[in-house]
Amino acid sequence: MKKFQAVIKDPVGIHARPASILASEASKFKSELKLVAPSGVEGNIKSIINLMSLGIRHNDNITIKADGADEEEALAAIKACLEKNKVI
C-alpha cells in the first residue's frame, strides 16, 4: 500500500466537479483507491457520491491511499489530477 497526504486548496473543497474528475481518473486503475478525511472516515475515490459525502473542505488535510497491482501509477495519476485541477 502506498499513500500521500495533501491540503485542499480549492476554496469550495471537494464538490461535484472535482469528485467527478477524480472518480473518472481513478476508474482507470485496478488498485483500490481511498481518500481519508480529517475525521478518519475513508471514501472510495471511484465513487462520486462517496467522495462528496466525506464533506472535504478548504484547508482540510487528506490522505490518499492506493493498494493493488498498479498502486504506484494510480497514486501518481491521482496526485497529478488533483494538482492539475488546483484541488491541492
From Swiss-Prot:
GO terms for biological process: phosphoenolpyruvate-dependent sugar phosphotransferase system. Residues 1-88 form the HPr domain. Keywords: Cytoplasm, Phosphoprotein, Phosphotransferase system, Sugar transport, Transcription, Transcription regulation, Transport. The modification Phosphoserine is found at S47. SUPFAM superfamilies: HPr-like. The active site is at H15 (pros-phosphohistidine intermediate). One of its GO terms (cellular component) is cytoplasm. This is Phosphocarrier protein HPr. It comes from Mycoplasma genitalium (strain ATCC 33530 / DSM 19775 / NCTC 10195 / G37) (Mycoplasmoides genitalium).
